[in-house]
Amino acid sequence: MSGLIGKNVGAGCTYFELYAGGAGAALDLLLGGNVQRIVLNDADIHIYYFWDSVLHYTEDFLRLMWDTPVNMDTWQRERAVYDENDLPDENNPGNHSPLEIGFATFFLNRTNRSGIITKAGPIGGANQTGKYRMDCRFNKGNLAQKIERIAARANDIEMHNEDTLAFIQQNVERLSAPHSFMYLDPSYYKNGSSLYLNAYNYQDHENLSNLMAGLRDLKWMISYDDVEENHQLYEGFRTAQHELNYFLQQKRKTNEFLVFSDTINKLVF
């Protein structure tokens, strides 16, 4: 990704990642000095609360992390916090604070199999008899260092909680700027509902394709699962396939389907 941005955008890039999730690519680019600013968006309020807590309530978040034991009792409690329907907003304090919900999201991501929050159980199983235990990805010292590095760049990180298509339509002028680059990583076409809380259906995927068809002169890339339906949705666009390693129970290889705007030199990817 850094090569793609360096070749097509250059220095001073504002990088938009609009299905942010863990925002791994965006943070690597920012902390690696490859972009100047990142703009994150996720329609999932749980993800938004996590990032808002890390960026603006860092000490409280870290204190909660250090004080929280990593065991099944905690897992059950954090699962209940995450699943709570009475979420706080400007008119309702809810049963749990944004910080508590953001931390529950973080805890489940670090302790669940493959980091899947919504429909996966803890690493090692409910009885913690598996080869690996739920704390194997919860090294508090390492996590604290990462969080502190991210929080130190809070002024260069902008976070939103909006529908992605609406965000794009409302920010076309910003996205059209010479040093802007947009990366879209929507939910998988197949099996997306088992991985994402706000998984897209066919109409959602089609709406995204139709929107991007009118924005080919901007600088952007979309990554998808490599299935025939996506090839059909993006027929006529500039596309490529890219081999990807991923972990769901065991290491596997698959092809990622990439879609590029007309202004992007995809050969440097």
Task: Please provide the spans of the model-predicted regions.
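Conserved S-adenosyl-L-methionine
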Residues: 8-73
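A residue-level signal for conserved active-site and pocket-lining positions in enzyme catalytic cores
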Residues: 21, 51, 106, 220, ...
